[in-house]
Curated annotation (Swiss-Prot):
It comes from the Bacteria. NCBIfam families: PRK13676.1-1 (NF010209). HAMAP family: UPF0342. Belongs to the UPF0342 family. SUPFAM superfamilies: YheA/YmcA-like. Transmembrane segments: none annotated. InterPro entries: Com_YlbF, YheA/YmcA-like_dom_sf. This is UPF0342 protein SPN23F13380. It comes from Streptococcus pneumoniae (strain ATCC 700669 / Spain 23F-1).
Length: 112
C-alpha cells in the first residue's frame, strides 16, 4: 500500500502537469514581465490580504472597500494580461474544487 504522503506528492506533481496549471503559470509570468500589470496585480493582492485580515477579526469592510474593489475590477478587465490570468485561474479552480470534494469525502462521511 502506498504512503498517503506519496499520493499527495503525486497529486501535486499531477496538478503541475495540467495544461490549465501551465496556462496560469504562463499568464502569471506575462504579468511579471509587464510593469503596469505587475503593479496592479501586486496592489490587488495586498488589497485581498487586507480584506482577509478584516474577515479574520470579524470586521466588515466599509463602503470604501467596495469602491476600491470596483476600481480593481475595472483595472483588471481593462488589462488583457490580468483578465487572462484570472480567467485561466478560474479554469484551474474547477480541478481544485473537484479534488477537494474527493479528498474530503471520507471526512464528511464521518460526520453523517
Amino acid at each position: 500500500m502506498s504512503n498517503i504522503y506519496d499520493s499527495a506528492n503525486e497529486l501535486s506533481r499531477g496538478l503541475r502537469g495540467l495544461p490549465e496549471y501551465k496556462a496560469v503559470k504562463a499568464a502569471k509570468d506575462a504579468i511579471a514581465a509587464d510593469a503596469e500589470a505587475s503593479k496592479i496585480f501586486t496592489e490587488y493582492l495586498a488589497f485581498q490580504e487586507e480584506i482577509q485580515k478584516l474577515a479574520h477579526t470579524g470586521q466588515m469592510p466599509d463602503a470604501s472597500f467596495q469602491a476600491k474593489m470596483e476600481g480593481f475590477g475595472k483595472q483588471i478587465q481593462g488589462n488583457s494580461l490580468l483578465s487572462e490570468f484570472f480567467t485561466k485561474q478560474q479554469q484551474l479552480a474547477i480541478y481544485l474544487s473537484d479534488i477537494e470534494k474527493i479528498v474530503f469525502e471520507p471526512v464528511s462521511e464521518l460526520l453523517k
